[in-house]
Regions:
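Transmembrane helical core of 7TM receptor-like proteins
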Residues: 1-350
Length: 350
């Protein structure tokens, strides 16, 4: 069995991997690393950016605040406004919740890493971050698939929409999305968790990315790679094919409609179709950028960070701009808080 301890390349000098933990030290006799010595990982992140590091910190912090604020607003209005009773808003509520937790698994830890010289994370914390980052990412795609099915039923079977999309069906679809994500994620992350880590312990990414952590395994990971690729293909192909099928059927149905009905149907799908295009487009861009071009390690991390936060950042903006019902609900919500704020201000002044 081949032991892959570290990767020495022009972009990854060996001194980057010198362990900082006293529990995984090199043997002075034969140069091998002591087994079972890694007790924590060091997130390399963007420590080599110097002056650009603070610029990226501010951008990432502002983006994270907007992600939390925008998605929190959608969750609040979708759960409290009695006029937003359509199943679409129930699914949007869940998508916003997933986006918030998805970004929270990585961005706060990355922000703290900008402010410290060494960004460390415990082994359990690293694998929990890895698992939930991947699982929530797949859950987001699965919910987008459920939303595509919802649009298909609404446009192609409008008279049976309320009979099909009942409360139990909505809950079943959401539970199915979460279950599908767990099924596609747990095998790969659990296999990586059980592998031995003898050192080095530097993760060459902005967070505990699965492939970056697997490079630190001191054992043969060929089976792990096959399992990871298989389930990644299953997750992306299943959701992608189902979304594409839904929109093909919607397109066929729209061809039989009048112009006014066709425009209304397109308006119903526009926000979701935009989000789907951005989600799969950004994922494809990150995949391609890692395999072509002369990208440095820091540039690749920046690309992956920005594009992983892009969809959660744009979701509330897109749905707020393209959905009139949601716009009106946000205005009603803000108008309810405005009189209370004025009364409170008057009380303070008196």
């Amino acid at each position: 069995m081949e032991l892959v301890l570290f990767d020495i390349s022009p972009e990854s000098p060996r001194d980057l991997y010198l362990p900082l933990s006293t529990n995984h030290r090199s043997s002075s006799v034969n140069g091998t690393l002591e087994p079972h010595g890694v007790t924590f990982f060091i997130i390399q992140g963007l420590t080599n950016l110097s002056e650009r590091k603070m610029i990226l910190f501010v951008i990432l912090l502002l983006g994270y605040i907007i992600i939390l604020g925008g998605n929190s607003m959608i969750i609040f209005v979708a759960s409290t406004d009695p006029k937003l009773t359509s199943p679409m808003y129930f699914f949007l509520y869940n998508l916003s919740l997933v986006d918030m937790v998805y970004t929270t698994t990585t961005i706060p830890k990355m922000l703290s890493g900008f402010l410290t010289d060494v960004n460390t994370i415990s082994m359990p914390g690293c694998f929990l971050q890895m698992h939930f980052f991947i699982q929530l990412g797949v859950t987001g795609y699965a919910i987008l698939t459920v939303m595509a099915y919802d649009r298909y039923v609404a446009i192609c079977n409008p008279l049976r929409y309320t009979a099909i999309m009942t409360r139990s069906i909505k809950l079943l679809l959401i539970m199915g999305a979460w279950g599908f994500a767990i099924f596609c994620t747990l095998p790969a992350t659990s296999m990586t968790w059980k592998r031995p880590y003898c050192g080095p312990n530097v993760v060459r990414n902005g967070w505990c990315d699965l492939s970056s952590v697997r490079r630190l395994v001191c054992a043969d990971t060929s089976v792990d790679n096959i399992v990871s690729v298989s389930f990644a293909i299953l997750a992306l192909l299943t959701t992608g094919v189902l979304i594409l099928t839904s929109y093909v059927l919607i397109g066929v149905s729209m061809l039989r409609m009048g112009v006014a009905q066709r425009l209304k149907a397109f308006g119903t799908c526009a926000a979701h179709l935009t989000v789907v295009s951005i989600s799969y487009g950004s994922a494809s861009f990150v995949y391609i950028s890692y395999r072509v071009g002369n990208f440095s390690a820091e540039d690749r991390i920046i690309v992956s960070v920005l594009f992983s936060a892009l969809t959660p950042f744009l979701n509330p903006i897109i749905y707020s701009l393209r959905n009139k019902e949601l716009q009106e609900s946000i205005r009603r919500t803000l108008s309810r808080f405005r009189p209370a704020a004025v009364i409170a201000l008057k009380d303070v002044n008196t």
